[in-house]
Swiss-Prot record:
GO biological process: 'de novo' IMP biosynthetic process
Gene3D superfamilies: 3.40.140.20, Methylglyoxal synthase-like domain
UniProt-listed SUPFAM superfamilies: Cytidine deaminase-like, Methylglyoxal synthase-like
Family classification: Belongs to the PurH family.
HAMAP family in UniProt: PurH
Keywords of the record: Hydrolase, Multifunctional enzyme, Purine biosynthesis, Transferase
Origin species: Variovorax paradoxus (strain S110)
Name this polypeptide is given: Bifunctional purine biosynthesis protein PurH
EC numbers, comma separated: 2.1.2.3, 3.5.4.10
Domain free text: The IMP cyclohydrolase activity resides in the N-terminal region.
PANTHER family tied to this protein: BIFUNCTIONAL PURINE BIOSYNTHESIS PROTEIN ATIC (PTHR11692:SF0), BIFUNCTIONAL PURINE BIOSYNTHESIS PROTEIN PURH (PTHR11692)
């Protein structure tokens, strides 16, 4: 008995060629609406579902395939005599292949100006119903929900006349995953809408925090272990990754990425993306230990490394410009876990292939988005999620950027243009340092970083000690504090270390006391009005 394929797709990529190949194998074609017309116009013999069921499409196409002749043909188990007898009694033919992709709900709601009515009309009913039926009966029915599966299916059909159980099961799992993703997207969209009973319609605005959140991720790879060897781990990505994000990285060489590599690489990449000029960020344990800008990648790296050569050992290095041979030669003198950049010259790649040890360096390439570095803003995470016991904390991501016009000078002494530039640089870096964060900067480079201390005083002292160990003078430096100084003692510590200007959010009950102390010490203080806690 000839096999039958039911084809009904919204995305028609590759479907005509696939249907032609199925026809060449003697497989009968069933189809609906626009798909049927496409196949018929190409000269393929195709039976409309309405002719197959004897029941016309109705309700503006809302009811097409919701019929026993369709679902009976998909759900009937060929190995159960009772099932076979039942479909024969009711004149139901079996369906062996189902090729369906769904109404483009996700693409519709992503469009500017999408209304609730637009969204509702793009909720597929018949497609998911057929997919579930076919996926449930995977031993007898192959269900294809993505054009990427066509080649796999066709190769097996041409080789052996049928799909293997392994392939059918894999397709079934993919189908259920697709339905879960689809229903999750609908739930997320509708859960974020407030219905205004007074006017009988939905609000035109949507909440960023829906009543129910349906996290949907795809596994990229299993990892050797988690943060520690006794922990198991895997790396997942969003269903639709943003351009220029870490998950789009291509590993050009080196060992397999570890859990800690990925966590640190993300911290480095997000920081370096925030600079418009050539920049280098070196990260250790999710904290920047050296950040600098320069005329090119080589200069930026040299300055960043100079901040804290000890901590840079075994670090993660990120650039926002391609790496050339000169820069690679400088990096190769150190032990590096991960190197990441938008690109590499052949000379740079050759440096890391020169010895077996250098071949272990994990070299990642993250292609620039179509709009170049300026388009990286579009690839930032919009939400941050943190797991707590049996729950999640969700917040909008800290993507706030500061301009010179946003600053409020609160001291008698005014900042010079050079000091303003250093203050803005220090503030940008401080956002990526674990709280409590104190960052000394000068000349487009970090001079000392104090991170993750319970006391702001201790962070300031550590930053000063780091600079001393690196042989750097803090005289005349700019200092950023990610949160306000609760007392003047923190200010005194950074000024004693050599700072000439300070940027902090303000907002303390003792702001005036701290400002008066700045005037007393003869330093500049500006307020950002924004806090950058990072935990």
């Amino acid at each position: 008995m000839a096999q039958t394929a039911l084809i009904s797709v919204s995305d028609k990529t590759g479907i005509l060629e696939f249907a032609q190949a199925l026809h060449a194998l003697g497989i009968k074609l069933l189809s609906t609406g626009g798909t049927a017309k496409l196949l018929a116009d190409a000269g393929l013999p195709v039976t409309e579902v309405a002719d197959h069921t004897g029941f016309p499409e109705m309700l503006d196409g809302r009811v097409k395939t919701l019929h026993p002749k369709i679902h009976g043909g998909l759900l009937a188990r060929r190995d159960l005599p009772a099932h076979v007898a039942a479909i024969q009694e009711h004149g139901i033919d079996t369906i062996d292949l189902l090729v369906v992709n769904l109404y483009p709900f996700e693409a519709t709601v992503a469009k500017a100006g999408c209304t609730l009515e637009d969204a509702i009309e793009n909720i597929d009913i018949g497609g998911p119903a057929m997919v579930r039926s076919a996926a449930k009966n995977w031993k007898d029915v192959g269900v294809l929900t993505d054009a990427s599966q066509y080649a796999v299916a066709l190769a097996e059909l041409q080789a052996g006349g049928k799909l293997s159980d392994k392939t059918k099961f894999a397709f079934s799992v993919a189908a259920f995953n697709r339905i879960a993703d689809y229903d999750g997207a609908i739930s997320d969209y509708l859960s974020a809408i407030d219905f205004d009973a007074s006017i009988g319609q939905a609000s035109p605005t949507r909440s960023m925090f829906p009543a129910q959140s349906n996290g949907r991720f795809v596994k990229v790879q299993d990892l050797r272990y988690g943060e520690n060897p006794h922990q198991q781990a895997a790396f997942y990505r969003d269903l639709h990754p943003a351009p220029g994000s870490l998950v789009s990285a291509k590993q050009l060489q080196g060992k397999e990425l570890s859990y800690n590599n990925i966590a640190d690489a993300d911290a480095a990449w997000e920081c370096v993306k925030s600079f418009d000029v050539p920049a280098c960020v070196i990260v250790k344990h999710a904290n920047p230990c050296g950040v600098a800008v320069g005329k090119d990648a080589a200069e930026a790296y040299g300055k960043a490394f100079k901040t804290d050569p000890t901590s840079a050992f075994g670090g993660i290095i990120a650039f926002n410009r391609p790496v050339d041979g000169e820069t690679a030669q400088a990096i190769a003198k150190q032990f590096v876990e991960v190197l990441m950049a938008p690109g590499y010259t052949p000379e740079a790649l050759a440096v890391f292939q020169a010895t077996k040890v250098k071949q272990n360096v994990r070299v990642l390439e993250i292609a620039l988005p179509p709009g170049g570095t300026t388009d990286w803003d579009n690839g930032r995470n919009l939400m941050d999620v943190k797991r707590v016991g049996s729950g999640l904390l969700m917040q909008t991501a800290d993507n706030h950027e500061l301009a010179a016009s946003d600053l409020k000078v609160v001291t008698k002494k005014q900042p010079t243009p050079e000091q303003l530039q250093d203050l803005l640089f220090a503030w940008k870096v401080a956002k990526y340092v674990k709280s409590n964060a104190i960052v000394f900067c000068a000349g487009g480079m970090t001079m000392g970083v104090g991170a993750g201390q319970m006391s702001r005083l201790d962070s300031a002292r550590i930053a000063s000690i780091k600079a001393e160990h690196a042989g750097l003078s803090l005289k005349g430096t700019a200092v950023a504090s990610d949160a306000f100084f609760p007392f003047r003692d923190g200010l005194d510590v950074v000024v004693d270390a050599g700072a000439s200007c300070v940027i902090q959010p303000g907002g303390s009950m003792r702001d005036q006391e701290v400002i008066d102390a700045a005037d007393e010490r003869g330093v500049v203080m500006v307020l950002s009005g924004v806090r950058h806690f990072r935990h």
